Amino acid sequence: MITPVSGLALAGDATDAAKLAKSYQLWGGIRTNHVISSSGSFVDQLGSSRGLSTPEDLDLLIELRKLADLVVVDAATARNEKYKRLSHAHLAIVSASGDFTSIPATSATDKVTLFSEAKPTVETAGVDHHQIASVDPFRQILLWAKGLGMSSILVEAGPRLTKICFETTKVSQSAITFTPKLPRNAVNGSMNPFSPSGELVSLAESTDASFTLWSY
């Protein structure tokens, strides 16, 4: 059960993940998505975000993917989270080194594209690959996506690639889930690890998480 608190969530009477995602509305450009612990960590002790997530957060992630044309993830996250081909959106996996080993999605025959500066270190037959500059990958990914008519991009990367995304491109929004739930008066710009100037446009909560949407 999700309780809408303010902004878009409250206006949309978002009492579950599907309604919350719908209240966020469609977007153009880049929306980033993250789950973060109250201490600011992006991963658990096993190096995965799954240990931080909650059932409602996972449901929200699925709903946000349904609204996206393209999901972008770094290879390390795709490996740790065992990413597979997505049912709704196209999946782009980014690696500076070209290491795409142990990622289930690389066995897909469609809807998956690999991006790296170096050539892939493993055989990825049937999967499209593009060589790009690792210092500014998003500019090239955006051009590629635009050419294919993809306008709504969801970035699910870790903090390093997300930081590059903010430095080199225009990010429209960030959907950030905090676990466990934060006191309502503690949800402010200082909690946003990417841009303290972001405007909080939506707040909702469950028993163990705070769901926020920031606009830039």
List the model feature ranges, each with a label.
Residues 1-216:
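Enzymes that bind and transform nitrogen-containing heteroaromatic metabolites
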